[in-house]
Amino acid sequence: MRLRTFESFWLLKNGLLYTYPSLQNNIKTEILVIGGGITGALISDALMDAGYEVTLIDRRDIGQGSTSATTSMLQYEIDEPLKDLAKKIGEEAAALCYQEGITAIQDLKKLVKTKKLNCGFQMKESLYIAHNKTAAKELYPEFEIRKKYQLGVKWLEPDAIKKTYGIVSKGGILSDTAASVDAYKMAHELIAFNVKRGMKVFDQTEIISIQDQGKTPKVITQENHTINAQKIVFCTGFESLNLLKEKVAKLIYTYATVSEPTQTYNKNLEKILIWDTQDPYLYMRTTDDGRFLVGGEDSVYKDTILQQNIKEEKSKMLIKKLKKTLPDLDFIEDISWGGIFGTTKDGLPYIGESPEYKNCLFCLGFGGNGITPNHAVEIF
């Protein structure tokens, strides 16, 4: 499955940061992490911290799946509004999910600082705006339930939003915990950090089968080499759907475009991440090299090929919506791309064991909750 178009901004910006050999012999390891994107990087780091012997493999070069296509916006919100999630799993449980999102962002901040990762990590605020009066009326109860659970929110009226940020809206929720990052670079930096302390990494290593050997599973690669592990952790995101009989997520296309470097935008925009109530929603952020990035225009997944002409149409639509939201922004398109992502019925990730695979665990973040799986090491 091809998870992005070729022109991913983060990949073009950074290039191939670190390279690793493919597996050329049979090996044994305590924990095998499959997937070298941001989730695999975070999980393997947590396992190394806990003292495990870890081997990480990926069928591509590191970070070149959906991690290189993400907009790298870290928000505690998931795709399901808190008030709606409360109806599905209960108010207390729903609030806990949101609170864990805040904790995850704070933990990522500590991780970046402690391990001195050069990945453009910046703490920000998050502005969730209503695009019309009806949306504002529906958004205000969301603000009230977030305020009830002390999630660090304020309600901003349209005039205040326009004056401070130059954004046209009908009001919105300002949250005090969010962050932006270069997830592709962070994955590379974190994996390189752990290689220095003993983790083994093999890229361009594809699995063709997993054999159940009772207490220890055995992986067979395309080159007919074997990996014996005590536990396997799948951090392969949306590609894991091919392994599971249960349909845990629905695949979608999502699109993004980034401007040329510019210094003409309202500098207050550098302090926030922006998303709105439209369906499909629009999300916006600045980058650490002075660009403006806009994404969204999600569409139903139909096949494995992201068509170039569709990507161009979506890019035009994103820019059109952006200019309605930020009419004073001088946006000159530079790079546009698309990727395949997934959504679940409640917006929550899937973390844990599957009855289909003994001694195997799955850490699958879908939709807007990709920041949370770094806590999944607790399942051990």
Language model regions located:
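Flavin-dependent oxidoreductases
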Residues: 209-287
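Helical element adjacent to the flavin cofactor pocket in flavoenzyme catalytic cores
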Residues: 145, 169-230, 235
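Glycine-rich active-site loop/strand segments that organize a redox cofactor
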Residues: 70-100
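Glycine-rich FAD pyrophosphate-binding loop
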Residues: 49-69
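Extreme N-terminal leader/targeting segments of oxidoreductases
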Residues: 1-31
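C-terminal catalytic lobe of FAD-dependent flavoproteins
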Residues: 302, 307-308, 323-380
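N-terminal Rossmann-like FAD-binding beta1-loop-alpha1 element of flavoenzymes
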Residues: 27-56
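Rossmann-like flavin
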Residues: 88-193
